[in-house]
């Protein structure tokens, strides 16, 4: 029993050793001993183990064909004539051979260069140092020439960039200056528009004041006719288109109304006992241009021998005028004169005295509007005519 168990154990060990040896040697020789020593693996895709003898025969075939660059797997297989070799085996081995040869060639070249340099250093004595320096200095310009060209190109590029930056900065400054100029122009335009708006507002205020005065006077004297501001504006536009220079002021509108409504005014003047002065318009315009002072119209309301003959036409004093008119509604006179001339003020007072004497004689029932009372003294003094070109609201 013991002998049998020992024998079985030996068999198991021997079988295990055989299995290990078979695993350790995966490449097996061909079936026949005359296969030229090819060792193939037992895989599904068998691989060839290149032995030194097989590799030498491969190198001989490659050299016969003219080198690794000219040799091909088919020609190598024909030259070698070993059965069992395939194109797959030869192709992979040829690629490896070419790579190794190129690497060896590069390494040999480097080794050769190093060896030559060491030999040159060993052979150069002290007497030949000048020649060696000349030889070393000679090829330096060729080596440094690409570097110098690159530096010059870089310097040129930097110079051009600097010029472009200068041009851009100059353009930026010009753009900023142009923007400031446009801003100043816009500010000036806004200021002028604001002034024009203020002027229009003043004209509107003057129109409102005039309409209030007309309404109050027309309420007291319904027989007397006054022009509305709209009619005055229409007459002003007609006057600008026909005869007079372009003046959109309220005074020019009032003066233009006399020429356009002459016939209707004649009837009204005859009915109210109004006396008008018929003069030359050109002479009137010349006198207006020659006069440097500012003319103003003053409405005067007189009561007997008392009262101020010249009152301003502000809206705040309208009530005072109405109170005077209520006391003496039959004594209405309009005096036109220049401020600063005492003689003209005295003449206006004389006119008021004349009107009072006429009213005492029996003319109190009618309203007399005297527009020009100094016709007889035209040669000695300046004529006083109903001219509203110098009229303004203060």
Curated annotation (Swiss-Prot):
Inactivation phenotype: No visible phenotype when grown under long days conditions, but early flowering when grown under short days conditions.
Transmembrane segments: none
Region (Disordered): 338-363
Domain HTH myb-type residues, every copy: 42-102
DNA-binding region in chain numbering: 73-98
Pfam families linked: Myb_CC_LHEQLE (PF14379), Myb_DNA-binding (PF00249)
Outcome recorded upon mutating residue 72 to A: In isoform 1 and isoform 3; no effect on nuclear localization
Comp. bias (Basic and acidic residues): 350-363
GO cellular component, one term: nucleus
Region (Coiled coil): 148-168
UniProt superkingdom: Eukaryota
Record key words, sorted: Coiled coil, DNA-binding, Nucleus, Transcription, Transcription regulation
Induction summary: Up-regulated by nitrogen deficiency.
Free-text tissue specificity from the UniProt record: Expressed in phloem and/or cambium.
Molecular-function GO terms, alphabetical: DNA binding; DNA-binding transcription factor activity
Phenotype for residue 74 to R: No effect on nuclear localization. No effect nuclear localization
Motif segment (LHEQLE): 161-166
Alphabetical list of InterPro entries matching this protein: Homeodomain-like_sf, Myb_CC_LHEQLE, Myb_dom, Myb_dom_plants, PHR1-like, SANT/Myb
Family that this chain belongs to: Belongs to the MYB-CC family.
Function: Transcriptional activator that may activate the transcription of specific genes involved in nitrogen uptake or assimilation. Acts redundantly with MYR1 as a repressor of flowering and organ elongation under decreased light intensity. Represses gibberellic acid (GA)-dependent responses and affects levels of bioactive GA.
Subunit relationships: Isoform 1: Homodimer. Isoform 3: Does not form homodimer.
NCBIfam families cross-referenced by the UniProt entry: myb_SHAQKYF
UniProt-recorded name of the protein: Myb-related protein 2
Natural source organism: Arabidopsis thaliana
Gene: MYR2
